[in-house]
Amino acid sequence: MTVYSTPRGAATALTACRRLSAMGRLELQLAPLLLNSNKRRRLSLNSTVNAIAREFLENKQILALQRKLENRSKTMSNWLTPWWLDYAYLMSRTPLPIVTSPGVTFPKFNFTGLQGQLECAAKMIHAVLKYHHNILESKLKEDKAGGVPLDMSQYQLIYGTTRIPKHGKDEIRYGKDAGKWAQHIIVVRNGHSFHVPVYDTTGVPLSVPQIQSQLHKIIAESESVNAFPINICSSDDRDKWAQVYDRIKKNNCQSISSVENALFVVALDRTDGRSSPSTADNMGQAIHGGGPPLAMLLDYVCDQFDQEAFNTTSNASAFDSPSKLNFQLTNDDRNAIIEASNRIDKAAANLEIVSLGFDHYGKNVPKAAGLSPDSFIQLAMQLAYYKLHNSFACTYETGTLRKFAEGRTDTIRLPNEDSAEFVQMTSSRRPDFSKLAKYLREAVHEHKDYSKMVMNGNGIDRHLLGLKILAKLDEPNSTLRLLSSPAYNRLLQFQLSTSQVPTRHVLPMGYGPAEVDGYGCCYNPQETRIFFSITAFKSSSISSALRFSKELQNSLHLMRDIIDQTSMGKTKPKL
């Protein structure tokens, strides 16, 4: 059981040295590297690890690396983000679907038949284009957390962003850097890809009827299934995809350019999932800006449907018709398509997904007891895991750094000593509810305090990552005892990978586990209900998304009982 966070003094020192970026956002500076001394800021309960930590902090190489990292933070608006993109995403060679690229389900829209599908798709495209212009015209309401404004630059990265496969490290291209925004999208149907203009010749977005007419035009050319859809190779291992990409680019430059420059991709396929997937490189990934900005877009699309806020008046200006992308492929390319298709089918079949709508209560219950809803839900997941596996789960929770310019994420960790005490006490045969209430409150406050530290730039995970990267850059063959120790490596093996992505509409979002025997758990706490998307790998003999979902419900019920049957349910302490 391990927790590593910065000391109380570090937050003050950090605040004092922050600068404002050119956009008026706080610049992410570096916290002092200090040894935690009290219980709340302990490094570990393990004396061996503490000894290694003391040695680590007194190491001359570490102190030199810390100075270099501090200098980097003084010369950049965000010392972390460029490295984070490279090491967490672009250098990763694993396939994008399942773990890196999240999936999301829209509410069921009421339509029937092909015509209804095309009208619904046209409205969705129209709404997404409207949101694009809201971003360009700075019409979005500023995001805030606890009254603090958040960096909005990530919204600029949603449209036209493409990850180009390269050997060893991919390349990221942003639509905003193209000089001129694209005016087309890619539509995929039955494995066929189409370049579809969505603006008229004067640069005005097409109306819903005009977009629908564009979609109608591709139907006749996509009735049969394309046996060799090259898009599917983008779902493969990144080096394998890079090898195919290098081959096909020679004879398909125009088609590839059309895909890479598109604003976004739309798939008009069957619900059984047997049609070929759209291009993974051009889909909404965490690399585009994270869950919350994408969630805001999805909420906006749903709002447009609720309000029927669509432009149905067509302009008189002409617009270009869709054009089919015909790829010239070799036998090697066709074999690569078959192999990639088999691999993604196998990976998809191995993923267990449980969508849980917990409608007994939502944020209202923990809030009424003066408890943080997020911390409350995190403890419920800790309890569920412990009851299933009789062990504590090394847990990753996404902590936003959007308070800072170009901010991405850091890690909010569990378990800690307080959460462990609560979980163990709750799992005892005859739990004392009055004691459980005390443990629950302490565990919630401990998690909430560390969450605030992380979001204020005082998290330890990215700090250690920075030191590790610098060490490798300075001396590629060097090893730092702590950063190569089994204890540190275990810290990076997350049995629970969690993230809160709040939306107003019911938009379940999910992703796969970080470990073969772990769980992915994306959750959306609303006022009177909580939605979870829980995943596990079917090949694991240890994890089960279904069993976890049942134990999670039991934990949530038990935690409400603790509130209702003690003074927690009668008083409302200040959050």
Roles of regions detected by a PLM:
Residues 1-575:
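Long, Pro/Ser/Thr-rich low-complexity/intrinsically disordered regulatory tracts in eukaryotic proteins
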